[in-house]
Amino acid sequence: SPAELTGGRGLYRWAKSVGAFEGPAQRARGSVEQVAALSIAMTADQKRMLEVAGRYPLLSESELALMLRQRVWTVRRSLERSIAQGLIEAVVGPVTKGLTRSDVRYVMTELGLRLVAARERIPARRYAEHGPFAATIGAGERGRLQTLIRQFEHTVGANRFFLDCLAQSEAGGPSLREWQSVSDTTIRFESNGVRRTIRPDGTGKVVHDGVERRFWLEWDRGTERIAVLLEKLDRYAAYYRSHTFSDGSVPQLLVVCPTPHREDVVWRAAEAVF
């Protein structure tokens, strides 16, 4: 009754009665009640983890612990509960040899996205299209997250680069202060009357000696054909030509290559278009 739901204890009992603490609140009447019940049942650690999993898809358990600055066992407990509630989903890469914990990576589900969208008071569909999170949407193969999963090794590699930067950040030394993942990094611009788009593998901000430097990451695994590489670099060149930057504000393009030979290939391609 309304009287019973007055105050925190009543809401807590209601969320428990619809099964929000053990699962995805299956006894809730409709999706709005389901999201409301899960929001009450979630812990503060779960809410933080859900946002990280949405912003940075395909992180492992230990990588989530690094991002959240928590112990692995704390993250594991939050993951187990969130998976049971249908907010987080485990993904195993296509080249994985076994089902060890390090092979399993995690993504936000559609239900998790609906919960975050409701908290921001934004329709879920609009949030899925324009928000900073990538999540499993329906059963199709379209969408930001589905693309990242298809490019599993590439996505995981780019994530690892930023995570290594984060782990090696030192007080007084170079420090990674900002990271926008590939799912949250799209630059649209106009060059010579033509609309163009750049999609780096992430954006970072490094601070050293009080100076901030932004960069775009291109994680090059050496598998891209030269024609594709040239076309990608040409978009960056067009962006730089069409913009005026104040001192120190120009974002640097950082291409990480797997071998010295591939680095030579990238340099020659850059010289051809810049």
PLM features: residue spans?
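Accessory beta->alpha helical hairpin/"wing" motif in late/C-terminal subdomains of nucleic-acid enzymes
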Residues: 92-131
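Residues within the helices of the helix-turn-helix
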Residues: 51, 62, 80
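Short acidic, hydrophobic short linear motifs in intrinsically disordered regions
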Residues: 55-67
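Pre-recognition alpha-helix immediately N-terminal to the DNA-recognition helix
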Residues: 44-51
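Short, solvent-exposed loop/turn segments at secondary-structure junctions
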Residues: 56-59, 95, 113, 186, ...
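Electrostatic, structured charged patches in enzyme active sites and in nucleic-acid/phosphate-binding
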Residues: 1-36, 40-44, 85, 117-274
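Short amphipathic alpha-helical interaction segments
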Residues: 69-84
